[in-house]
């Protein structure tokens, strides 16, 4: 990726997260980035293509943040060591929610602005959510649950709910409640397995 393309994507992502996807015009991205319109259109045929590129970038950022947080926080978890990585994910998400960069879930926000399921932007959001479920499934693999995919989806729903509650109500306890609920859920499944 060229440095100008990266700069455009980074600038657009920052603006889209702060102001919304539809509310942020190309002129605002150009003004903030200092890049010429011709350069933007050399890299992206449309605003939609730019949005999809920002979602791909955000997907990479999210997974990096999650992996780094898990690596940093897994050994600080108490209880069943097989759950340490998934519990660390909740702590990493709490750290994100407490940061200045937190504007809720970029993918929930984008899919709300582009609600048609066949829209390529909505498809990119749905693909991210599928990747998150796969990531969660990897984190709980040590538990050797009979239907780990369904359990991963349940934990994903807990995370989604906590992110939305934290964003809309500013209630960070939602993350702690989701973590406790996930621990109870996983414990009950692990005992039954």
Which residues does each PLM region occupy?
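Amphipathic alpha-helical segments used for helix-helix packing
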Residues: 97-119
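Conserved acidic functional residues
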Residues: 27, 109, 160
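Short, basic, alpha-helical segments at the C-terminal edge of helix-turn-helix-like DNA-binding modules
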Residues: 56-62
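Helix-turn-helix
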Residues: 7, 11, 15-49, 53
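Hydrophobic alpha-helical connector segments
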Residues: 53, 67-99, 152-155
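Hydrophobic/aromatic-rich alpha-helical bundle segments in the mid-to-C-terminal region
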Residues: 121-127, 141-189, 193
